[in-house]
């Protein structure tokens, strides 16, 4: 059975989070947690928290055995962007986009 966990509006761009998500797609959850623990990226912290949440959901809601779980699906969608202004020389201004992302992890025992 499949169990889902999400982190919406994570303060990192979808492009950066997808680099980390690609590392654990299809792996067993124990191996995926080890990979994320030693991945030196800010996005790895976000993905690890969502994966741990999905594992807890599977254990609590579905009574799944942790040893049988694997990362069935993981995908990252773009969230809303916060628009900010950066003052520049000679009275000009640039628009800065502070991007967010929605991280979804699905674990399965099949």
From Swiss-Prot:
Subunit and interaction comment: Part of the 50S ribosomal subunit.
GO biological process: translation
SUPFAM superfamilies: Ribosomal protein L22
Key word Ribonucleoprotein present: yes
Pfam family, one: Ribosomal_L22
Name of the gene this protein is made from: rplV
Function, as annotated: This protein binds specifically to 23S rRNA; its binding is stimulated by other ribosomal proteins, e.g. L4, L17, and L20. It is important during the early stages of 50S assembly. It makes multiple contacts with different domains of the 23S rRNA in the assembled 50S subunit and ribosome.
GO molecular function terms noted in the UniProt entry: rRNA binding; structural constituent of ribosome
Lineage top rank: taxon: Bacteria
GO CC annotations on file: cytosolic large ribosomal subunit
Protein name per the record: Large ribosomal subunit protein uL22
């Amino acid at each position: 059975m499949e169990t889902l966990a999400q982190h919406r509006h994570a303060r990192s761009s979808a492009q950066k989070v997808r680099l980390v998500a690609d590392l654990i797609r299809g792996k067993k959850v124990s191996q995926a947690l080890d990979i994320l623990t030693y991945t030196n990226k800010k996005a790895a912290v976000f993905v690890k928290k969502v994966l741990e949440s999905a594992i807890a959901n599977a254990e609590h809601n579905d009574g799944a055995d942790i040893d049988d779980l694997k990362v069935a699906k993981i995908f990252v969608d773009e969230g809303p962007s916060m628009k900010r202004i950066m003052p520049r020389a000679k009275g000009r201004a640039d628009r800065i986009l502070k991007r967010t992302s929605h991280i979804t992890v699905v674990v399965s025992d099949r």
